């Protein structure tokens, strides 16, 4: 988002520096294979970052947008504070491990929901594959690809994955079905064998898929109080003709509740004192 908000023309090009190369290559992080001196557009670098999770692309963008990587990281921290994050601190642009680089699922939800308001962020983060140097780079979110039967979820869209030895496997993914939209955030999930499988499973994708299946099957947007419905009575002090008055809903009240919830289970709390006009 720092890049999208500060670069108006994503066709502008910038070069890979030696410092950006050294910060990514050889670290064990995923890279796109950008070479020192290679010139790429911001548009390409954003696709490599969001689709391929390319650490080297992140480093190039950080230097270009921030002037220095350190200043870009400051811009990142300023931006997340602006969207209400209180438990996040970044020390680098790519998410490589650092004891002082941290966040929470709650803060990541704030970051993602704010970012999803930007149409360009949606475009880059939900692209399922990107052509680069003659190769088709698939989105690192395996929930988007039918070939991965264990992980694939037809309603999934984007957004971002990340993994390090310390943080293990993480995914933020959106899913839309029948007019409902949910965001799943799974962090520090292991890679392990499940049941009798002979291979290791990235549990972040399995868990996100399970969360979506539960939400779509178990929750429903429901009108619990209809407009003009009488929901109770309140006392009236010094009433001319009555000591009470009916309390009527001015509008429908719609909330997401468990499927099959008995309306009698809904508790309506009424203020002790209500001003009648």
State each model region's role.
Residues 1-106, 113-119:
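Active-site-adjacent loops and short helices of periplasmic peptidoglycan-processing enzymes
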Residues 85-86, 99-102, 106-277:
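Domain-terminus/edge residues, biased toward the C-terminal soluble/receptor-binding domains
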